[in-house]
Protein backbone atom coordinates (compact mmCIF):
# COMPACT_ATOMS: atom_id res chain seq x y z
CA UNK A 1 0.00 0.00 0.00
CA UNK A 2 1.21 3.49 -0.77
CA UNK A 3 2.46 5.87 1.89
CA UNK A 4 1.97 8.82 -0.45
CA UNK A 5 0.19 10.85 2.25
CA UNK A 6 3.59 11.32 3.89
CA UNK A 7 4.32 13.99 1.30
CA UNK A 8 1.50 16.17 2.64
CA UNK A 9 3.57 17.01 5.72
CA UNK A 10 6.31 19.67 5.59
CA UNK A 11 9.72 18.09 6.12
CA UNK A 12 13.22 19.54 6.38
CA UNK A 13 15.91 17.58 4.54
CA UNK A 14 18.34 17.09 7.41
CA UNK A 15 19.49 13.52 6.71
CA UNK A 16 20.02 13.30 2.97
CA UNK A 17 20.93 9.87 1.63
CA UNK A 18 19.44 6.77 3.29
CA UNK A 19 21.40 5.47 6.25
CA UNK A 20 23.18 2.17 5.56
CA UNK A 21 21.59 -1.23 6.06
CA UNK A 22 24.46 -3.63 6.66
CA UNK A 23 25.05 -7.32 7.24
CA UNK A 24 26.98 -8.14 10.44
CA UNK A 25 29.04 -11.22 9.52
CA UNK A 26 30.96 -11.71 12.76
CA UNK A 27 27.95 -11.17 15.01
CA UNK A 28 25.95 -13.50 12.77
CA UNK A 29 28.58 -16.21 13.10
CA UNK A 30 28.68 -15.68 16.86
CA UNK A 31 24.90 -15.96 17.27
CA UNK A 32 24.26 -18.56 14.56
CA UNK A 33 21.70 -16.31 12.87
CA UNK A 34 21.82 -13.77 10.05
CA UNK A 35 21.85 -10.31 11.65
CA UNK A 36 21.50 -7.03 9.75
CA UNK A 37 21.65 -3.52 11.16
CA UNK A 38 19.99 -0.27 10.12
CA UNK A 39 22.58 2.40 10.87
CA UNK A 40 20.51 5.33 12.09
CA UNK A 41 23.42 6.04 14.41
CA UNK A 42 25.08 7.52 11.30
CA UNK A 43 22.61 10.33 10.61
CA UNK A 44 24.73 13.37 9.80
CA UNK A 45 24.14 15.86 12.62
CA UNK A 46 25.68 15.96 16.12
CA UNK A 47 27.09 12.42 16.23
CA UNK A 48 23.97 10.84 14.77
CA UNK A 49 20.85 9.14 16.04
CA UNK A 50 17.21 8.40 15.38
CA UNK A 51 15.73 11.65 16.67
CA UNK A 52 16.87 13.50 13.56
CA UNK A 53 14.20 11.64 11.58
CA UNK A 54 11.51 13.02 13.89
CA UNK A 55 13.06 16.47 13.88
CA UNK A 56 12.81 16.68 10.09
CA UNK A 57 9.05 16.93 10.57
CA UNK A 58 8.95 18.73 13.92
CA UNK A 59 11.44 21.46 13.02
CA UNK A 60 9.66 22.02 9.70
CA UNK A 61 6.45 22.57 11.65
CA UNK A 62 8.24 24.95 14.03
CA UNK A 63 9.48 27.05 11.11
CA UNK A 64 6.02 26.99 9.54
CA UNK A 65 4.65 28.45 12.78
CA UNK A 66 7.30 31.18 12.84
CA UNK A 67 9.04 29.92 15.97
CA UNK A 68 12.46 31.23 16.95
CA UNK A 69 12.97 28.83 19.88
CA UNK A 70 12.79 25.05 20.27
CA UNK A 71 11.88 23.80 23.75
CA UNK A 72 12.15 20.17 24.80
CA UNK A 73 12.87 17.97 27.80
CA UNK A 74 14.68 14.81 28.80
CA UNK A 75 17.34 13.29 30.99
CA UNK A 76 20.71 14.97 31.47
CA UNK A 77 22.13 12.44 29.00
CA UNK A 78 19.22 12.65 26.55
CA UNK A 79 20.11 11.88 22.94
CA UNK A 80 16.91 13.59 21.85
CA UNK A 81 17.78 16.85 23.60
CA UNK A 82 21.28 16.79 22.10
CA UNK A 83 19.93 16.35 18.57
CA UNK A 84 17.22 18.99 19.09
CA UNK A 85 19.86 21.46 20.24
CA UNK A 86 21.98 20.69 17.18
CA UNK A 87 19.03 21.24 14.83
CA UNK A 88 18.27 24.53 16.56
CA UNK A 89 21.87 25.63 16.07
CA UNK A 90 21.80 24.63 12.40
CA UNK A 91 18.60 26.59 11.82
CA UNK A 92 19.67 29.65 13.80
CA UNK A 93 17.09 29.06 16.54
CA UNK A 94 17.36 29.40 20.31
CA UNK A 95 17.05 26.12 22.25
CA UNK A 96 15.84 25.63 25.81
CA UNK A 97 16.18 22.20 27.45
CA UNK A 98 14.41 21.09 30.62
CA UNK A 99 16.51 18.32 32.15
CA UNK A 100 16.15 15.83 34.98
CA UNK A 101 18.60 13.46 36.67
CA UNK A 102 16.59 10.21 36.48
CA UNK A 103 19.19 8.04 38.18
CA UNK A 104 19.96 10.51 40.98
CA UNK A 105 23.71 10.28 40.51
CA UNK A 106 26.30 12.83 41.47
CA UNK A 107 28.93 11.31 39.17
CA UNK A 108 30.75 14.13 37.40
CA UNK A 109 30.89 12.37 34.04
CA UNK A 110 27.13 11.86 34.00
CA UNK A 111 26.47 15.45 35.00
CA UNK A 112 28.86 17.14 32.59
CA UNK A 113 30.24 14.79 29.91
CA UNK A 114 28.67 13.02 26.93
CA UNK A 115 25.42 14.54 25.68
CA UNK A 116 25.44 17.18 28.42
CA UNK A 117 28.80 18.51 27.22
CA UNK A 118 27.44 18.80 23.69
CA UNK A 119 24.50 20.91 24.89
CA UNK A 120 26.97 23.54 26.02
CA UNK A 121 28.73 23.43 22.66
CA UNK A 122 25.37 24.10 20.97
CA UNK A 123 24.79 27.07 23.31
CA UNK A 124 21.66 25.51 24.80
CA UNK A 125 19.81 27.22 27.63
CA UNK A 126 19.54 24.46 30.23
CA UNK A 127 16.90 24.44 32.96
CA UNK A 128 17.02 21.73 35.64
CA UNK A 129 14.02 20.20 37.41
CA UNK A 130 13.72 17.63 40.18
CA UNK A 131 11.81 15.21 37.96
CA UNK A 132 9.82 15.18 34.73
CA UNK A 133 6.67 13.98 36.46
CA UNK A 134 4.34 15.57 33.88
CA UNK A 135 6.58 16.63 31.00
CA UNK A 136 3.81 17.99 28.76
CA UNK A 137 2.57 20.30 31.50
CA UNK A 138 6.10 21.26 32.56
CA UNK A 139 7.06 22.10 28.97
CA UNK A 140 3.95 24.23 28.53
CA UNK A 141 4.80 26.15 31.71
CA UNK A 142 8.36 26.67 30.48
CA UNK A 143 7.10 27.82 27.08
CA UNK A 144 4.85 30.40 28.77
CA UNK A 145 7.83 31.72 30.72
CA UNK A 146 10.05 31.83 27.63
CA UNK A 147 7.33 33.56 25.62
CA UNK A 148 7.08 36.24 28.30
CA UNK A 149 10.76 36.96 27.64
CA UNK A 150 9.95 37.84 24.03
CA UNK A 151 10.67 34.52 22.29
CA UNK A 152 8.35 32.56 20.00
CA UNK A 153 8.70 29.01 21.35
CA UNK A 154 7.76 25.71 19.75
CA UNK A 155 7.41 22.78 22.15
CA UNK A 156 8.84 19.43 21.09
CA UNK A 157 7.67 16.55 23.32
CA UNK A 158 10.03 14.19 25.12
CA UNK A 159 11.76 12.03 22.52
CA UNK A 160 10.07 13.97 19.72
CA UNK A 161 7.37 11.36 20.12
CA UNK A 162 4.04 12.60 18.90
CA UNK A 163 2.05 11.74 15.77
CA UNK A 164 4.02 14.26 13.71
CA UNK A 165 7.48 13.25 14.88
CA UNK A 166 6.74 9.54 14.51
CA UNK A 167 6.25 10.10 10.78
CA UNK A 168 10.04 10.07 10.63
CA UNK A 169 9.94 6.35 11.32
CA UNK A 170 7.23 5.68 8.80
CA UNK A 171 9.74 7.25 6.41
CA UNK A 172 12.43 4.97 7.85
CA UNK A 173 10.25 1.91 7.20
CA UNK A 174 10.02 3.00 3.58
CA UNK A 175 13.82 3.22 3.43
CA UNK A 176 14.21 -0.22 5.03
CA UNK A 177 11.74 -1.82 2.62
CA UNK A 178 13.52 -0.33 -0.38
CA UNK A 179 16.93 -1.48 0.88
CA UNK A 180 15.71 -5.02 1.58
CA UNK A 181 13.86 -5.45 -1.71
CA UNK A 182 15.57 -8.10 -3.80
CA UNK A 183 18.39 -8.40 -1.25
CA UNK A 184 17.08 -10.01 1.93
CA UNK A 185 13.73 -11.04 3.37
CA UNK A 186 13.79 -9.90 6.98
CA UNK A 187 11.74 -12.05 9.35
CA UNK A 188 12.09 -9.93 12.50
CA UNK A 189 12.93 -6.31 13.31
CA UNK A 190 14.20 -5.32 16.77
CA UNK A 191 14.16 -1.75 18.09
CA UNK A 192 14.46 -0.04 21.48
CA UNK A 193 11.06 1.16 22.70
CA UNK A 194 11.19 4.23 24.95
CA UNK A 195 9.17 7.36 24.26
CA UNK A 196 7.38 5.19 21.67
CA UNK A 197 7.58 7.36 18.53
CA UNK A 198 10.23 5.30 16.75
CA UNK A 199 8.44 2.05 17.58
CA UNK A 200 5.00 3.38 16.56
CA UNK A 201 6.23 4.87 13.28
CA UNK A 202 7.95 1.63 12.33
CA UNK A 203 4.83 -0.33 13.27
CA UNK A 204 2.68 1.70 10.88
CA UNK A 205 5.21 1.70 8.05
CA UNK A 206 6.25 -1.94 8.25
CA UNK A 207 2.64 -3.13 8.43
CA UNK A 208 2.10 -1.52 5.04
CA UNK A 209 5.43 -2.37 3.42
CA UNK A 210 6.82 -5.54 5.07
CA UNK A 211 3.84 -7.23 6.70
CA UNK A 212 5.70 -10.53 6.94
CA UNK A 213 8.26 -9.01 9.35
CA UNK A 214 7.69 -9.35 13.08
CA UNK A 215 8.45 -6.04 14.86
CA UNK A 216 9.69 -6.33 18.45
CA UNK A 217 10.15 -3.37 20.76
CA UNK A 218 12.55 -3.95 23.64
CA UNK A 219 11.47 -1.62 26.43
CA UNK A 220 14.08 0.61 28.04
CA UNK A 221 12.01 2.28 30.77
CA UNK A 222 8.67 0.56 31.39
CA UNK A 223 6.88 -2.74 31.78
CA UNK A 224 4.77 -4.05 28.92
CA UNK A 225 1.64 -3.01 30.84
CA UNK A 226 2.85 0.60 30.98
CA UNK A 227 4.49 0.80 27.56
CA UNK A 228 1.85 -0.90 25.42
CA UNK A 229 -0.82 1.84 25.70
CA UNK A 230 1.75 4.48 24.75
CA UNK A 231 2.87 2.65 21.61
CA UNK A 232 -0.67 1.73 20.56
CA UNK A 233 -1.96 5.29 21.04
CA UNK A 234 0.84 6.68 18.86
CA UNK A 235 0.47 3.89 16.31
CA UNK A 236 -3.20 4.76 15.87
CA UNK A 237 -2.56 8.51 15.78
CA UNK A 238 0.12 8.11 13.10
CA UNK A 239 -2.07 5.80 11.02
CA UNK A 240 -5.00 8.22 11.28
CA UNK A 241 -2.82 11.12 10.13
CA UNK A 242 -1.91 9.08 7.03
CA UNK A 243 -5.48 7.85 6.50
CA UNK A 244 -4.39 4.26 7.07
CA UNK A 245 -5.66 1.36 9.15
CA UNK A 246 -3.25 0.12 11.82
CA UNK A 247 -4.23 -3.43 12.71
CA UNK A 248 -0.86 -4.99 13.55
CA UNK A 249 -0.42 -6.15 17.13
CA UNK A 250 2.35 -4.46 19.10
CA UNK A 251 4.97 -6.83 20.52
CA UNK A 252 7.05 -5.72 23.50
CA UNK A 253 9.73 -7.45 25.55
CA UNK A 254 10.32 -5.94 28.98
CA UNK A 255 12.91 -8.35 30.39
CA UNK A 256 15.96 -6.20 29.70
CA UNK A 257 15.49 -2.66 31.10
CA UNK A 258 15.92 -3.33 34.85
CA UNK A 259 16.82 -1.75 37.18
CA UNK A 260 15.32 1.21 35.30
CA UNK A 261 15.67 3.91 32.67
CA UNK A 262 19.17 5.31 32.36
CA UNK A 263 20.77 2.73 34.65
CA UNK A 264 23.07 0.26 32.89
CA UNK A 265 22.68 -3.46 33.50
CA UNK A 266 25.02 -6.40 33.04
CA UNK A 267 23.43 -7.89 29.92
CA UNK A 268 23.17 -4.49 28.23
CA UNK A 269 26.81 -3.67 28.86
CA UNK A 270 27.83 -7.14 27.66
CA UNK A 271 25.96 -6.43 24.41
CA UNK A 272 27.72 -3.05 24.05
CA UNK A 273 31.11 -4.75 24.41
CA UNK A 274 30.19 -7.63 22.10
CA UNK A 275 29.19 -5.44 19.17
CA UNK A 276 32.21 -3.18 19.66
CA UNK A 277 34.59 -6.14 19.69
CA UNK A 278 32.99 -8.12 16.86
CA UNK A 279 31.88 -5.36 14.48
CA UNK A 280 33.49 -2.09 15.59
CA UNK A 281 30.02 -0.57 16.12
CA UNK A 282 29.18 1.44 19.23
CA UNK A 283 25.93 0.90 21.10
CA UNK A 284 24.93 2.76 24.27
CA UNK A 285 24.04 1.71 27.84
CA UNK A 286 20.54 3.25 27.91
CA UNK A 287 18.80 2.20 24.68
CA UNK A 288 20.61 0.13 22.09
CA UNK A 289 22.68 -1.95 24.51
CA UNK A 290 19.52 -3.16 26.22
CA UNK A 291 17.75 -3.69 22.89
CA UNK A 292 20.67 -5.75 21.60
CA UNK A 293 20.64 -7.74 24.84
CA UNK A 294 17.02 -8.55 24.01
CA UNK A 295 17.93 -9.65 20.49
CA UNK A 296 20.73 -11.90 21.76
CA UNK A 297 18.62 -13.47 24.49
CA UNK A 298 15.68 -13.76 22.11
CA UNK A 299 17.78 -15.99 19.86
CA UNK A 300 19.03 -18.03 22.82
CA UNK A 301 15.53 -18.47 24.23
CA UNK A 302 13.95 -19.01 20.78
CA UNK A 303 11.54 -16.11 21.29
CA UNK A 304 11.42 -15.11 17.62
CA UNK A 305 8.59 -16.48 15.50
CA UNK A 306 10.92 -18.03 12.94
CA UNK A 307 14.60 -18.40 12.22
CA UNK A 308 15.01 -16.00 9.31
CA UNK A 309 17.23 -12.90 9.19
CA UNK A 310 16.86 -10.30 11.96
CA UNK A 311 17.22 -6.55 11.45
CA UNK A 312 18.41 -4.47 14.40
CA UNK A 313 17.50 -0.78 14.18
CA UNK A 314 20.45 1.14 15.64
CA UNK A 315 18.99 4.35 17.02
CA UNK A 316 22.32 5.83 18.10
CA UNK A 317 23.36 7.07 21.53
CA UNK A 318 27.13 6.50 21.55
CA UNK A 319 27.88 9.96 23.09
CA UNK A 320 26.40 8.63 26.34
CA UNK A 321 29.26 6.13 26.60
CA UNK A 322 31.47 8.96 27.85
CA UNK A 323 29.02 9.64 30.66
CA UNK A 324 28.87 6.01 31.77
CA UNK A 325 32.50 4.97 31.42
CA UNK A 326 32.88 3.51 34.96
CA UNK A 327 30.37 0.84 33.90
CA UNK A 328 32.54 -0.14 30.92
UniProtKB/Swiss-Prot annotation:
Transmembrane segments: none annotated. One of its GO terms (biological process) is D-amino acid metabolic process. GO terms for molecular function: D-cysteine desulfhydrase activity. CDD domains: ACCD. InterPro entries: ACCD_DCysDesulf (IPR027278), D-Cys_desShydrase (IPR005966), D_Cys_desulphydr_bac (IPR023702), TrpB-like_PALP (IPR001926), TrpB-like_PALP_sf (IPR036052). It comes from the Bacteria. Its EC number is 4.4.1.15. The modification N6-(pyridoxal phosphate)lysine is found at residue 51. SUPFAM superfamilies: Tryptophan synthase beta subunit-like PLP-dependent enzymes (SSF53686). Its cofactor is pyridoxal 5'-phosphate. Keywords: Lyase, Pyridoxal phosphate. The keyword Nucleotide-binding does not apply. It catalyses: D-cysteine + H2O = hydrogen sulfide + pyruvate + NH4(+) + H(+). Pfam families: PALP. PANTHER family: 1-AMINOCYCLOPROPANE-1-CARBOXYLATE DEAMINASE-RELATED. Catalyzes the alpha,beta-elimination reaction of D-cysteine and of several D-cysteine derivatives. It could be a defense mechanism against D-cysteine. Belongs to the ACC deaminase/D-cysteine desulfhydrase family. Homodimer. This is D-cysteine desulfhydrase.
Amino acid sequence: MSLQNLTRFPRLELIGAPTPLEYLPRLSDHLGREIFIKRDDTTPLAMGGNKLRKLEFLAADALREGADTLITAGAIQSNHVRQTAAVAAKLGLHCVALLENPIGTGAENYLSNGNRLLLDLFNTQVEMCDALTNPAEQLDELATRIEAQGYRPYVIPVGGSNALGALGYVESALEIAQQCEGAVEISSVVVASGSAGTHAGLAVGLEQLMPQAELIGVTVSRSVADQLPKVVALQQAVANSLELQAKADITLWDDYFAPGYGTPNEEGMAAVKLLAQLEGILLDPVYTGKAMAGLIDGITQKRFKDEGPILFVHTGGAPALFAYHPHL
